[in-house]
Amino acid sequence: MNIVICCRQRLTVYMHLSIEPLNGVKGLPLGSSKATVRSFFSGELKVFRRSPTSVPADHWPDLGVFAYYKADGALEALEFTSPAILELGGASLFPISMEVALRFLRQTDPHVKVEIDSAISNALGISIWTAIGKEADSQVETLLLFGAGYYG
């Protein structure tokens, strides 16, 4: 669902999406073709590479969405930044503080791997990251959705 907010200077489109653990978001499963992904998201598309040898990825800056692909063009992971809005099981998971996000992930997956600036739930296919670290007031800056085996 898109929520559109208009002002005099700029039109902002907020993506409000439901996470499907280990499978992307409702309506766009991991493994989808690049064409399907590009038709799912609207707005300005920028294609880039994370490294000189990586597979080209897509970025919709106005939506806060990145799409990463396998060599065959299948959707491998989705990454979200502001202004995207994500929920899981009816609970808002992005935007949210790291403290609340970690508490939520641990309730669902007791084996969450926690680092200084991130956490990974292989059981849910969700990774969260912040530049600030795990301070209580730090906000999740990116949320990555991935499938089984993404982190090895």
Where are these regions (language model features)?
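Short helix/turn-capping signatures at newly exposed starts of structured segments
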Residues: 5-152
